UniProtKB/Swiss-Prot annotation:
Gene Ontology MF, one: G protein-coupled receptor activity
Lipid bilayer topology: Multi-pass membrane protein
Gene name of this polypeptide: OR5P2
Source organism per UniProt: Homo sapiens
InterPro entries recorded: GPCR_Rhodpsn (IPR000276), GPCR_Rhodpsn_7TM (IPR017452), Olfact_rcpt (IPR000725)
Keyword flag Calcium: no
Cysteines joined through disulfide linkages: C93-C185
Protein name: Olfactory receptor 5P2
Membrane spanning stretches: 29-42, 51-71, 96-116, 136-156, 193-213, 234-254, 268-288
Keyword annotations: Cell membrane, Disulfide bond, G-protein coupled receptor, Glycoprotein, Membrane, Olfaction, Receptor, Sensory transduction, Transducer, Transmembrane, Transmembrane helix
Pfam families, alphabetized: 7tm_4 (PF13853)
Subcellular location: Cell membrane
Keyword Cell membrane included in the entry's annotation: yes
Positions in the Cytoplasmic compartment: 43-50, 117-135, 214-233, 289-322
Length: 322
């Protein structure tokens, strides 16, 4: 974008990000933990036939969304450190903003789809294979990504309608919309309403779906006579509810509450939760609380160890013969 004169102002061609932390080692460690944890979940679900169910199909895409969400923010921080700069171009800022909005929405709607999956599994177990067939799962996933695309378009379009005259220092570690609005010298009322409505709609709809699903799940669990049934049903929902509480709490604070109700520094701290901390914790939450994932991980590790030992003994035997 070329510099354009507007009265006594000059349109900005880029922004300076004030950053999250000056410790490059911490940046690398956090990013590698996020990548390795979520990538491990995806690979485990793909290679383990015991996990080829709709629940884990959605979980693998949740891990992908976490990984991609963090990757849309963190690598830029690392590159800026390596070249000793904290700048991002106008186009780069728009891409980063749209990517973050896309994957945040994908995670929102995925959590609702996972709640529906748990609802069908617990409340209608005999019809589960029909109601959550491969075709239905793919259709739900298509809705997830379409919703993400629409929200991303609304964010990037609103961004391009803003005029930035200076200063260009963004008090954030990535191009989030709230700190960008503070730098705009144009009317932000329409953009604020549009984005609050679009983000709020996604949050309200998905929260309602999750709430209704869990109300029916709770009613079904309370009707169960078996203590073992109670424990099994609750254990399958605990990890999902934990992730839902963490994620929706942070994004509601950022994207739904009015900007004047919190400071930019508070915005930055809360943003760390959903861009860094939550993507890092999600694999741990689902792994530690899910017996099927722990069992699949143990089976794959044992299989790898046994196959390695078999190859070793085979080579040893061949050497002895020769």
């Amino acid at each position: 974008m070329n510099s354009l004169k507007d009265g006594n102002h000059t349109a900005l061609t880029g922004f300076i990000l004030l950053g999250l932390t000056d410790d490059p080692i911490l940046r690398v460690i956090l990013f590698m933990i996020i990548l390795s944890g979520n990538l491990s979940i995806i690979i485990l679900i793909r290679i383990s036939s015991q996990l080829h169910h709709p629940m884990y199909f959605f979980l693998s895409h949740l891990a992908f969304a976490d990984m991609a969400y963090s990757s849309s923010v963190t690598p830029n921080m690392l590159v800026n450190f390596l070249v000793e700069r904290n700048t991002v171009s106008y186009l780069g800022c728009a891409i980063q903003l749209g990517s973050a909005a896309f994957f945040a929405t994908v995670e929102c709607v995925l959590l609702a789809a996972m709640a529906y999956d748990r609802f069908v599994a617990i409340c209608s177990p005999l019809l589960y294979s029909t109601k959550m067939s491969t075709q239905v799962s793919v259709q739900l996933l298509l809705v997830v990504y379409i919703a993400g695309f629409l929200i991303a378009v609304s964010y990037t379009t609103s961004f391009y309608f803003l005029l930035f005259c200076g200063p260009n220092q963004v008090n954030h570690f990535f191009c989030d919309f709230a700190p960008l609005l503070e730098l705009s010298c144009s009317d932000i009322s329409v953009s604020t309403v549009v984005l609050s409505f679009s983000s709020g709609s996604i949050i309200v709809v998905t929260v309602c779906v999750i709430a209704v699903c869990y109300i029916y799940i709770l009613i079904t669990i309370l009707k169960m006579r078996s203590t073992e049934g109670h424990h099994k049903a609750f254990s399958t929902c605990t990890s999902h509810l934990t992730v839902v509480t963490l994620f929706y709490g942070t994004i509601t604070f950022i994207y739904v509450m009015p900007n004047f109700s919190y400071s930019t520094d508070q915005n930055k701290v809360v943003s760390v939760l959903y861009t860094v901390v939550i993507p890092m914790l999600n694999p741990l939450i689902y792994s530690l609380r899910n017996k099927e994932i722990k069992g699949a991980l143990k089976r794959e590790l044992v299989r790898k160890i046994l196959s390695h030992d078999a190859c070793y003994f085979s080579r040893t035997s061949n050497n002895d013969i020769t």
